């Protein structure tokens, strides 16, 4: 193999990504919707709101027998592996020792008492974090990052978006 052939081979290899990077680029082409992992303590009605009203791509653990009784650590790992932002009401996910930000794909912890406020705050999250339907170009740009909140945690409560 000559120098020219080695250079061409090297250029081809540098153009190819890892399986993970190739998967991410395919995923970006398929969906611009926020990819959500809703754990077991998120109400089915709220999941329906995320899917129907906000048009989010939501994996709801209650609908999957193998995930329904998984530990919090397993939910965190699976959400990241599936390139999804985890949404929960479990405040344990805010503990940085147990759930290091560098080891998550983004976590949204909600602490909201009533359904109406939860929906309003999810709409705010859609607008301010995921780009929302009004900001279609921003949503497309965020889709290229695949997990917009990767390595971050947000404690969503009344007034969180006014700070």
Per-range role (PLM):
Residues 54-60:
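A generic structural motif
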Residues 1-12:
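Helix-enriched interaction subdomains in cytosolic or periplasmic regions
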Residues 20-30, 34, 39-40, 44, ...:
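Acidic, PIN/NYN-like endoribonuclease modules and their adjacent C-terminal/linker elements
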Residues 17:
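Divalent-cation
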Residues 62-68:
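Short beta->alpha junction loops
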